[in-house]
Amino acid sequence: MHPIVIIGSGMAGYTLAREFRKLNPEQALVMISADDAVNYAKPTLSNALAGNKAPEQIPLGDAAKMSAQLSMDILSDTVVTAIDPDQHELTLEHNGQTRQQVYSKLILAVGANPIRLAIGGDASDDIHVVNSLIDYRAFRERLAERDDKRVVILGAGLIGCEFANDLQHTGHHVTVIDLSARPLGRL
């Protein structure tokens, strides 16, 4: 039987694999991730600064550890470029090489992408989106390089407010901008 394939190595993908393994330890599983497939709790990103957690302290396990723990193949840094549902086949690209991957069942656990605003100007290089551990690492590096402790957060939803609180606790002066009349307007 062909493997069950999970596209995405975020919280949903790893939780699905973990829960499925409890029910079926034998079925072949393959996880495909466009990034390094490091397992971490994404909510940690919005409060790690105040907790003095370096990016290296956040992961719960790298791809090799998770592969062994969940008895599944993990294809990291691999992009799905096509899905053929009739043939139950994926086209994958890794390091410029293309290959096919068959599946019995396919699960899309790709998460969400943040809205990236088209903002220009001489400070546009200082705009960071923090949606992954890789993004968080780059954000922390940029904060460490700057003498200026001012930070502007676009979005006063739960994550934006958590980031604002986290940054304030670490000595940053934070301004939160949102279209809503008040913070947490959608809750």
Question: What is each model feature region?
Answer:
Residues M11, D36, A112-P114, I134, ...:
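Residue-level detector of alpha-helix initiation sites
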Residues T15, R116, A138, E162-F163:
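Phosphate- and divalent-cation-binding pockets in alpha/beta enzyme and binding domains
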Residues V110, C161-F163, L179:
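Generic detector of well-ordered alpha-helical packing
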Residues H2-M72, N165-L187:
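Beta1-alpha1 glycine-rich phosphate/pyrophosphate-binding loop at the start
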Residues G8, D84, E162:
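Acidic active-site catalytic centers that drive phospho-/nucleotidyl reactions
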Residues M1-V5, L60, A64-L154, L184:
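FAD-binding core/adjacent interface of flavoenzyme oxidoreductases
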Residues L154-C161:
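Short, conserved structural micro-motifs that define repeat-unit consensus positions
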